[in-house]
Regions:
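Active-site activation/catalytic loop segments of kinase-like enzymes and analogous catalytic loops
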Residues: 254, 258-302, 318-337
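All-alpha amphipathic helical-bundle segments outside canonical DNA-binding/catalytic cores
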Residues: 304-316
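Short, Lys/Arg-enriched N-terminal segments with co-localized hydrophobic residues
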Residues: 1-10
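Juxta-kinase regulatory segment immediately upstream of eukaryotic protein kinase catalytic domains
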Residues: 11-33
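ATP-dependent phospho-/nucleotidyl transfer catalytic cores
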Residues: 35-39, 60-71, 126-141, 156-226, ...
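Activation of the activation-loop gatekeeper triad in protein kinase-fold domains
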Residues: 247-252
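Long, compositionally biased intrinsically disordered regions
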Residues: 360-363
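Conserved ATP-binding subdomain of kinase catalytic cores across diverse folds
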Residues: 34-37, 41-177, 257, 273-277, ...
Length: 375
């Protein structure tokens, strides 16, 4: 599937083909080129320039192997961006086209264009903006505010409005089912070398399914989440260094608030790499956790329940555990999901995520105590 996707990708299109695709959209000015842009892993992204050489639009080919329901995907994004735009207008904000992504309809008023093989969409380019890759406490505080504000603006979207673009994406019970299937089938004959890790996962399984149980008991509600809360999914103003808007909205869908803070802690507060072979490098950076949480609570306290606030640090452990389970599942299955760069890559990733989980567990009391300020 992945090879098929690569063969089909946007980079294989000629300039004429790309300009013809762009011509299907309601653009407001003439464009002359579309060049590869950014370093996203999922979709193909191109920057589109006008005759003066200014970047005006962003053209994306949607990866329909991952987002199989493109109608739902674009409908979700349309609902979310319109909702945010309305909130910004009500607040009397200026410069709104830089504070929310603006997707352009096709000439027949569709949210995407299908060329017979691929699905395409176009949004306005946000001028004088930049994103960061590294994570500092200062940026984490800004990120917390940005994602808290994002959730806050979307808190009044009624449950049931948005679809799940990747079903069961952060559903721990589902991820454990996949894991148990992998163990049962032992497709790649690797069980013997990962027995200890399997035991560690089983030991924690029940405690890691709290959110699904609380939801069934009516004690936790589903909210609109971003589900990919990385520091590079925010655009900053190049002059003021303040966050303009949150981008990469493909995974915006109903879920639990623990997911968004949890994934930021997992990716941003790790002192090592996600696939660090030297486990001594991998620990939780508590300053990053505190900075993100402080920024997040400034914006999100107004709509969170005491139960949600109390569980936020648990979100970090949950998402790290979930990723450990997913990497190990893929290793046991024979590396069928994640791209690998060496035969043991998924095992190295599993061990690195598990080390981060152990570090988060060691700091659990300190992280829980930090939340008492808001309870």
């Amino acid at each position: 599937n992945y090879q098929l996707y690569q063969l089909n990708n946007a980079m294989a299109k000629t300039k004429e083909q790309l300009l013809n695709i762009l011509d299907q959209f309601q653009l407001t000015e003439k464009v002359v080129s579309a060049e590869p842009f950014g370093n996203g892993h999922i979709n193909d992204t191109l920057k589109v320039t006008n005759e003066k050489g200014e970047i005006k639009y962003v053209l994306q080919r949607i990866n329909h192997l991952i987002f199989t329901n493109v109608d739902m995907l674009q409908n979700n994004i349309q609902i979310v961006t319109s909702h945010i735009r309305k909130k910004l207008e009500e607040k009397g904000e200026n410069d709104i086209d830089r504070k929310v992504l603006t997707f352009l309809p096709t000439k027949d008023n569709k949210l995407y264009y299908f060329d017979g093989d691929n699905y395409w969409r176009v949004c306005l380019f946000i001028p004088n903006s930049k994103s960061y890759e590294e994570v500092t406490p200062e940026l984490s505080y800004e990120a917390g505010k940005a994602f808290g504000d994002f959730q806050s603006m979307l808190a009044d979207i009624p449950e049931g409005t948005l679809g799940e673009t990747i079903p069961n994406f952060h559903n721990m019970e589902f991820r454990l089912e996949q894991f148990h299937d992998a163990v049962k089938n032992n497709a790649a004959g690797r069980l013997d070398e990962v027995k200890d890790l399997i035991e560690e996962i089983e030991k924690r399984a029940e405690a890691m399914c709290i959110q699904e149980r609380l939801y069934r008991e009516g004690k936790l509600k589903k909210r609109t989440n971003h589900c990919d809360t990385k520091v590079n999914n925010m655009m900053f103003d190049t002059e003021t260094d303040k966050v303009l808007c949150v981008i990469d909205l493909d995974t915006v869908m109903p879920g639990f608030v623990l997911s968004d803070i949890g994934d930021f802690i997992r990716t941003g507060a790790n002192t090592g790499a996600e696939d660090d072979a030297n486990l001594d490098n991998v620990n939780v950076n508590i300053d990053i956790f505190k900075a993100y949480t402080r920024g997040y609570m400034e914006k999100a306290k107004s709509f969170l329940t005491p139960m949600e606030i109390k569980l936020l640090p648990y979100g970090g452990r949950l998402l790290t555990y979930m990723q450990t389970v997913r990497f190990l599942t893929d290793y046991i299955n024979g590396d069928t999901y994640y791209k690998i760069h060496s035969p043991k890559h998924n095992l190295i990733r599993t061990k690195a995520q598990f080390k981060l989980l152990q570090s988060l567990e060691a700091h659990a009391d300190e992280m829980d105590a930090f939340m008492s300020e808001w309870l």
